[in-house]
Amino acid sequence: MAILGLGSDIVEIDRIAAVISRTGDRLARRVLSDNEWRQYQSHQQPVRFLAKRFAVKEAASKAFGTGIRGGLAFNQFEVYNDELGKPGLRFLEHAQEMAQKLGVAHVHVTLADERHYACATVIIES
């Protein structure tokens, strides 16, 4: 296994809250996959949920070395948790094609949040 990419991101949770108050669910619909959208709608802390997902997806796009552009979109990354709560990442659509081209075999995700910030790190390996 070799590290193909590393990305990290930090999000100010109040900025996400401000966007939601200005634009409603537009940001959430753009960022979240269908599965994540369903979770978001019933989550006890939807702003915090969205901020953490946003941070992971930004970190993942940085690990790819591209950022969000060239056909890559936030909702093509899907954050999930295993039975122990450990976060993982699925690639959908164009992100899945890019992962295959890069030879991604393993993905490591860590995320944390405190009062004001959510942060995430993503490592992709061959």
UniProtKB/Swiss-Prot annotation:
Transfers the 4'-phosphopantetheine moiety from coenzyme A to a Ser of acyl-carrier-protein. Belongs to the P-Pant transferase superfamily. AcpS family. It is found in: Cytoplasm. Its EC number is 2.7.8.7. InterPro entries: 4-PPantetheinyl_Trfase_dom, 4-PPantetheinyl_Trfase_dom_sf, ACPS, Ppantetheine-prot_Trfase_dom. NCBIfam families: acpS (TIGR00516), pantethn_trn (TIGR00556). Its main location: cytoplasm. Keywords: Cytoplasm, Fatty acid biosynthesis, Fatty acid metabolism, Lipid biosynthesis, Lipid metabolism, Magnesium, Metal-binding, Transferase. Its cofactor is Mg(2+). Transmembrane segments: none annotated. It comes from Erwinia tasmaniensis (strain DSM 17950 / CFBP 7177 / CIP 109463 / NCPPB 4357 / Et1/99). This is Holo-[acyl-carrier-protein] synthase. It catalyses: apo-[ACP] + CoA = holo-[ACP] + adenosine 3',5'-bisphosphate + H(+). GO terms for biological process: fatty acid biosynthetic process. One of its GO terms (cellular component) is cytoplasm. Mg(2+) binds at D9, E58. One of its GO terms (molecular function) is magnesium ion binding. It is an enzyme of class 2 (transferase).
